Amino acid sequence: MKFCIIGYPVRHSISPRLYNEYFKRAGMNHSYGMEEIPPESFDTEIRRILEEYDGFNATIPHKERVMRYVEPSEDAQRIKAVNCVFRGKGYNTDWVGVVKSLEGVEVKEPVVVVGAGGAARAVIYALLQMGVKDIWVVNRTIERAKALDFPVKIFSLDQLDEVVKKAKSLFNTTSVGMKGEELPVSDDSLKNLSLVYDVIYFDTPLVVKARKLGVKHIIKGNLMFYYQAMENLKIWGIYDEEVFKEVFGEVLK
């Protein structure tokens, strides 16, 4: 079978290396490529992708637009974002990755979620499924946060520090930190948290600061990615637990 990841930009993605090494190690004759699709070309290119590939993953900024071209699962419909496609059907495995990465961790409330895109939708949906009720969304544009259509309180970005000061858990679902940028949150606000969760795979300034301040639970996007990738392979019907654990540990070390 033939798979790929679509996004823009997507060159930074480790998915092709992970999946191709997994296929090789598991003795599977499959391939996983990369398709960088600018937003203005999406409507044309997505038709080609659906014809050319058995399945694919969608990342920023295409998770929401893919919905119109596939038959979405119930979870994907509620989240309004698809990140995994197999033979015309769309799924959201991000939220599963969030839930599984939080196993054994108490998510204390209130919870602050920074961002209002596809990753934020998955995080909020996962938290609601876990029974978390007091969720505060902080976003640059209030209108986009309102469009989430979840039972959450909404705040503007300039309120972030004062909101975090009153919270117990913080989830960053934006790309802030990927290039060394810092979220505008003071040490005083961060040190009162019991959980900091950043969807970015590596140590961002937020993660480094939280560690120095002694925040009890710190989770990075690599753990979410682990469970999300596992779920993708299960949907595609080609999951081998032993091989996956081995390959993932090597690729992300």
Curated annotation (Swiss-Prot):
The EC number(s) this enzyme carries: 1.1.1.25
Pathway: Metabolic intermediate biosynthesis; chorismate biosynthesis; chorismate from D-erythrose 4-phosphate and phosphoenolpyruvate: step 4/7
GO biological process: amino acid biosynthetic process; aromatic amino acid family biosynthetic process; chorismate biosynthetic process; shikimate metabolic process
One GO MF term: shikimate 3-dehydrogenase (NADP+) activity
Residues annotated as the enzyme's active site: K63 (proton acceptor)
The keyword DNA-binding appears for this protein: no
Enzyme class: oxidoreductase
Reaction catalysed by this enzyme: shikimate + NADP(+) = 3-dehydroshikimate + NADPH + H(+)
Chain residues that bind shikimate: S13, I14, S15, T59, N83, D94, Y201
UniProt keyword Cytoplasm present: no
Signal peptide region: none
Keywords: Amino-acid biosynthesis, Aromatic amino acid biosynthesis, NADP, Oxidoreductase
Gene Ontology cellular-component annotations: cytosol
Cross-referenced Gene3D superfamilies: Leucine Dehydrogenase, chain A, domain 1, NAD(P)-binding Rossmann-like Domain
Pfam families per the UniProt record, alphabetical: Shikimate_DH, Shikimate_dh_N
Residues noted as binding NADP(+) in the record, renumbered to the chain: E74, G115, A116, G117, G118, A119, N139, R140, T141, I142, E143, R144, V199, G221
Quaternary structure and partners: Homodimer.
Entry similarity comment: Belongs to the shikimate dehydrogenase family.
Function as written in the Swiss-Prot or TrEMBL entry: Involved in the biosynthesis of the chorismate, which leads to the biosynthesis of aromatic amino acids. Catalyzes the reversible NADPH linked reduction of 3-dehydroshikimate (DHSA) to yield shikimate (SA).
HAMAP family the UniProt entry points to: Shikimate_DH_AroE
Protein name, as recorded: Shikimate dehydrogenase (NADP(+))
Organism: Thermotoga maritima (strain ATCC 43589 / DSM 3109 / JCM 10099 / NBRC 100826 / MSB8)
Lineage: Bacteria, Thermotogati, Thermotogota, Thermotogae, Thermotogales
